[in-house]
């Protein structure tokens, strides 16, 4: 097995089981999010227009969770060893993602207010930190010369996301539109396919 021979071997709890559990939790989170989506209050174009902010918030939240599901899938598919630290880091990520429906519901009612807008960024920032912690735990369990270790030798996009989320939280006090624009920009940035795992597999 690759990795440092002096490092204690982690308990192999099965990446497949961890991925299946995480998929189920994320599916529940998306279901809760969808149940909170509100229909227009009337049959007119104006009623539909009035509902556009809530629709934007729903789409942003849905894409946010979908991005994490996609990256989580590729991350665990490149993982061969799962340690206890990986399990806990994964639970922390799921906890942060479970807060998305809460802040989304708050934004539905108060999308013009700075605090709810900043709260979305805080949850997004916490999720980004927890995903980074999960990546580090997986690399420690598998070794830096493993597929996942080579694929994520650097994480410029992840670090940039942290900076942008923090900027969005700070800007929410002065302009909620600017904060939403930053959150949306991060989502668009992550919609671009990540080729790191493919490149890492090619170097094996």
Label every PLM stretch briefly:
Residues 2-204:
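Multi-pass alpha-helical transmembrane bundle typical of ion/small-solute transporters
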């Amino acid at each position: 097995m690759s990795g440092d021979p002096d490092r204690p071997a982690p308990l192999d709890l099965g990446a497949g089981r961890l991925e299946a559990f995480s998929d189920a939790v994320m599916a529940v989170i998306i279901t809760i999010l969808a149940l909170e989506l509100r229909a227009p209050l009337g049959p007119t174009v104006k009623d539909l227009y009035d509902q556009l902010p809530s629709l934007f918030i729903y789409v942003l939240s849905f894409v946010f969770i979908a991005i994490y599901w996609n990256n989580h899938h590729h991350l665990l598919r490149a993982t061969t060893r799962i340690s206890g630290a990986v399990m806990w880091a994964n639970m922390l990520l799921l906890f942060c993602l479970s807060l998305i429906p809460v802040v989304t519901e708050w934004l539905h009612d108060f999308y013009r207010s700075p605090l709810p807008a900043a709260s979305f960024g805080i949850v997004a920032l916490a999720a980004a930190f927890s995903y980074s912690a999960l990546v580090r735990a997986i690399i420690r369990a598998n070794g830096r010369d493993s597929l996942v270790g080579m694929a994520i030798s650097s994480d410029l996009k992840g670090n940039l996301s942290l900076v942008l989320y923090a900027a969005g939280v700070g800007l929410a006090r002065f302009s909620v539109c600017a904060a939403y624009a930053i959150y949306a920009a991060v989502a668009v940035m992550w919609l671009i396919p990540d080729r790191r795992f493919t490149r890492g597999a090619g170097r094996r």
